[in-house]
From Swiss-Prot:
Family annotation (PANTHER family): VACUOLAR FUSION PROTEIN CCZ1 HOMOLOG-RELATED
Protein family (similarity comment): Belongs to the CCZ1 family.
GO annotation, biological process: vesicle-mediated transport
GO cellular component: lysosomal membrane; Mon1-Ccz1 complex
Designated gene of the protein: ccz1
Pfam family name, one: Intu_longin_1
Keyword Membrane on entry: yes
UniProt name for this protein: Vacuolar fusion protein CCZ1 homolog
Matches recorded under InterPro entries: Ccz1 (IPR013176), CCZ1/INTU/HSP4_longin_1 (IPR043987), CCZ1/INTU/HSP4_longin_3 (IPR043989), CCZ1/INTU_longin_2 (IPR043988)
Alphabetized UniProt keyword annotations: Lysosome, Membrane
Localization, UniProt: Lysosome membrane
Amino acid sequence: MAYAVQDKRFAPSLLSFFIYNPKFGPREGEEEKKILFYHPNEVEKNEKIRNVGLCEAIVQFTRTFNPTKPAKSLHTQKNRQFFHEPEEGFWMVMVVKNPLAEKQKEGKTVLEYQEDELLDKVYSSVLQQCYRMYKLFNGTFSRAMEVGQVELLKDRLEKFFHRYLQTLHLHSCDLLDVFGGISFFPLDKMTYLKIQSFINRIEESLNIVKYTVFLYNDQLIWSGLEQEDMRILYKYLTTTLFPRYTEPELAGRDSPIRPEMPGNLQHYGRFLTGPLNLSDPEVKFRFPKIFVNTEDSYEELYLIVYKAMSASVCFMIDASVQLTVDFCRKLDSLVGPQLTVLASDICEQFNINRRISGSEKEPQFKFIYFNHMNLAEKSTIHLRKTPSMSLTSVQPELMKILGDINGDFTRVDEDEEIIVKAMSDYWVVGKKSDQRELYVILNQKNSNLIEVNEEIKKLCATQFSNIFFLD
């Protein structure tokens, strides 16, 4: 009996990643000075120089056609190169190996590179995200040059990217990486006012706090930061910091750290950054530093992340302030009990609202929504997104169509709608209207174009009743 041999498939993977500045080694024989960081480091010196030189040549060549917009990517059969100039003269390059299928043809193994599977916009966004994450924790390249010349910059790049590149799981990158949006927690006015009042009280009591951010269930409720800074901080919190503490919580619910509190208040609060055990007199701690408003005031801040149940608060304090154990104890005793009560209130209100709206059966559609003005993002396609994986509830073929539709939207300024019928008989709809984008996947194989259009109108009326979508 003959069995069909299954094709072996290999996902896209990181081949190399490097950062260079052509001005640092302008003369012959000094080419190595241009290279500020190169991964993998084991690559032979001459090959590094050759690869950087090739990228330089490509950028220079494409500048002759468009001086202000040089190359963003280079397609070859086996890989794809992405270029990004985040600061003048500093170039970041990411080389991704194309997905691969291993097939059997006439008894021989044949390799087929599937270069069409990679979407430029997705991986260009990932490269830009690499820079923004570096800048959040290290500041700009040029500031490092001002402070400690090229050696300091090289040292910072090595320390950061050596670890960060290990968290880049390119096989799970998709449209959400293009948007880099923020998921907002739905809240009634009264509970929102309680949170606002809590933040005002804390900022008044702890007057060294410069900015505050409040999240519940990994979704944003309040932020005092600028949008672009909040966007990358949100990415760090939800894909790196919070997941680190999720597993221990799932193993067994936290018991109150100090059940006996004045006024019999329960206290579930604890630091996610900083001191692990405040009752230890010898406790050693360090808060991470972040850099915000790098375009103008260039602020260096300590990041304190404090959590009680499902509520998390980030306090940002000027890095010139000396933070002591006494300050941490004061913050803990002040914030812990109040945040515990607030987290219970939010949970109760959320459950009431869910009961009122009713638990509907599994809908026949899944969607991604993004608003460019406030970076609001909502997805029923993604079950979970962490650095190591992105669980999606739809086939990769459909995710690729969503990316293609987004690419079409980018090329035009006008509002528009695109409807596609996939090979698997699913309907995929993209709608762009007034700085908002909506992508819907419909599992209605027997529907026609008119019926699909009606379904989309119904969806907009039920899920986005307060948002105006042009017909």
